[in-house]
Amino acid sequence: MSNQRIRIRLKAFDHRLIDQSTAEIVDTAKRTGAQVRGPIPLPTRKERYTILTSPHVNKDARDQYEIRTHKRMIDIVEPTEKTVDALMRLDLAAGVDVQISLG
């Protein structure tokens, strides 16, 4: 597995959860002897919604909501067999979406 690269992309609404998960992944990969690049912070996506508070009149009365999607990317350059096994057994927070690709 010396020629391969593992790219891990993480998404979460809470930046504390995603930072904690990236720290766990980097610590696990370094402990097993792999070379790690990252975590690389990717642009945060901000979705804003404006909703009328009144069902009939008062067009000026509105509520605004925002949801932020935080993203991070980690490259594991030289993974070993122990690295892959440790990453498969790793238990991350429930609010973090993990995408793993081999390249």
Curated annotation (Swiss-Prot):
Which GO molecular function entries does the Swiss-Prot or TrEMBL record give?
structural constituent of ribosome; tRNA binding
- SMART domains in UniProt: Ribosomal_S10
Q: Name one GO cellular component term.
A: ribonucleoprotein complex
Which Pfam families does UniProt cross-reference here? Answer: Ribosomal_S10 (PF00338)
In terms of InterPro entries, this protein maps to: Ribosomal_uS10, Ribosomal_uS10_CS, Ribosomal_uS10_dom, Ribosomal_uS10_dom_sf
Keyword Ribosomal protein in annotation: yes
Give the GO terms filed under biological process for this record.
Answer: translation
User: What keywords does the record list, in alphabetical order?
Assistant: Ribonucleoprotein, Ribosomal protein
SUPFAM superfamilies xref list: Ribosomal protein S10 (SSF54999)
Entry keyword annotation includes Ribonucleoprotein? yes
Query: Which NCBIfam families does this one have?
Result: PRK00596.1 (NF001861), rpsJ_bact (TIGR01049)
- Kindly state the subunit structure of this protein: Part of the 30S ribosomal subunit.
Q: Which family does it belong to?
A: Belongs to the universal ribosomal protein uS10 family.
What does this gene product do? Involved in the binding of tRNA to the ribosomes.
Return the protein name: Small ribosomal subunit protein uS10
Organism for this UniProt entry? Colwellia psychrerythraea (strain 34H / ATCC BAA-681)
Print the organism lineage: Bacteria, Pseudomonadati, Pseudomonadota, Gammaproteobacteria, Alteromonadales
